[in-house]
């Protein structure tokens, strides 16, 4: 029997995730997932691709606040879901969308830890960022994700990969929202629809893996090749395990 093993949220794109027992789903995907994002001085989005130390910042939901914890720095809090803000336009993968500015203090906190000028911005409900229409026929939207509201991995797929690696890697490297157990290795490759309780999900496409999979989540440093290089001459080398899904 295939079971939902864990649920992970990423309140701010690129930071460490939060494991939760349950979550609500809104128009953007999992509630509170990637509604915050860091941008540089040109309002271009930032991720672990440029700043691998981002993964060392651990968010913590405390009521209506998002508490940020980083090694060697005092914790900092920002509103989890701001009710208002100064509008600005940000760029993510070449797309322009509306965002709200955070306080200057918040920008200083991130800049001090990451060693690069940056500041957090929030995606309000009024902002619209559509998923790729080639894979979504229902005008689905998403937050500051790489492209789709949900990412799914099977535990068996990671176990299969780790048998081929000299040093096993952790699930955290692949940053899934939904982790399933009880499936065969790479069974998610064949899934078209997924039912979790009363919610039905459409499997959109494999998710191409990027440099983020080479970031050691415990050290915040790049460490070697993409783990899926163990599948040479195989589409899985680029689309390892993880599935982009809609609801």
How would you label these PLM feature ranges?
Residues 1-247:
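Metal-cofactor-dependent catalytic cores
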